[in-house]
């Protein structure tokens, strides 16, 4: 990609950025490619301080409808395979392809399609539509107008908003805008 952009006359900068470093409780590493038609001084944004980042506690809803909770059999199965039985709540657990369950204080990257990396909050329930949006850094003013499955797909395909905002701000600085 870089070679093609440079062949078209762009000055290209590329770096892997993690959404965790820009304020959302999601480990989502993505390569970000920025190109300019003129030579400019550009630097990717620095990560924000840890104490300014949102945590799961910040984004989780307090009252969640019963439809988001999993069957007792799923909950019991996951809890029996949980690696750390004393992990403090709230956590998001991730089931890998081997069936191992690992809790984390952040989400793995949300996925658009089927994935072995099935996430549950406290091994009890699926994230709500609003929580998925918050994990991606969308403001609460963002309207939910599609069903759960489509929202999950859209959030899985999205980039983390704070990452792109920070990169865009750096681009504007480089262009003196």
Describe the function of each predicted region.
Residues 4-16, 21, 26-177:
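S-adenosyl-L-methionine-dependent DNA methyltransferase catalytic core
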